[in-house]
């Protein structure tokens, strides 16, 4: 299936409009994930025109790459510290809630529904339904539209390994996973930033083995 099949049966002009708009959306999402919040759009567009229209650059491409990479590195450091502080603040606040249990690793969970089935082992495959949230309540992953999924526990992030091997089949938990048990300093672009604490609502349907 080519790009035109994916976009639908529309004329060529509309295809290019959609592709161009979508390219802008995808690129903006990537920049926002890196921490860009106050781009000067005129300069940004000038930079793009320089490449596409082959005009004389105000700054050489090589120098532009260096400037961009250095700035991204500084942004990631700032984002990493900000996310770490926000995660610690949430976990600290959760300690005041008697319904939330904290494990030695720092992972926290609240039992929403207590199942009465088996508890899986690390080597098991399990069928789960879940929603994953960033700390601003934005959903970054969900089975809501695709239905229950089957995973091998040993291949999942550390936080999921730990919590799934404590849940009974039929259980539904709200889980708070600190960054060191999730995606750590690297994050998982484009949605999950470095040192992000994640919140999941996980329902363990059954052990598939």
Task: For the regions a language model picked out, list residue spans one by one.
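Cross-family detector of peptidyl-prolyl cis-trans isomerase
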Residues: 1-209
């Amino acid at each position: 299936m080519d790009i035109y099949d994916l976009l639908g049966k529309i004329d060529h002009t509309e295809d290019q409009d959609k592709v161009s708009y979508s390219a802008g959306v995808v690129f903006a999402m990537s920049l926002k994930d890196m921490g860009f919040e106050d781009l000067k759009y005129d300069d940004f567009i000038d930079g793009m025109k320089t490449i596409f229209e082959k005009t004389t650059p105000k700054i050489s491409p090589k120098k532009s790459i260096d400037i961009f990479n250095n700035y991204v590195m500084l942004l990631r450091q700032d984002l990493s510290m900000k996310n770490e502080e926000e995660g610690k603040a949430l976990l600290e606040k959760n300690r005041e809630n008697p319904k939330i249990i904290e494990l030695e690793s720092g992972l926290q969970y609240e039992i929403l529904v207590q199942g009465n089935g088996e508890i899986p082992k690390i080597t098991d495959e399990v069928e789960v339904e879940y929603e994953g949230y960033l700390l601003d309540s934005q959903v970054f992953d969900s089975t809501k539209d695709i239905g229950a999924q089957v995973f091998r526990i040993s291949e999942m992030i550390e936080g999921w390994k730990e919590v799934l091997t404590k849940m009974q089949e039929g259980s539904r938990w709200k889980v708070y996973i600190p960054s060191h048990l999730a995606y750590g300093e690297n994050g998982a672009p484009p949605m999950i930033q470095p040192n992000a604490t994640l919140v999941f609502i996980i329902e363990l349907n059954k052990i598939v083995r």
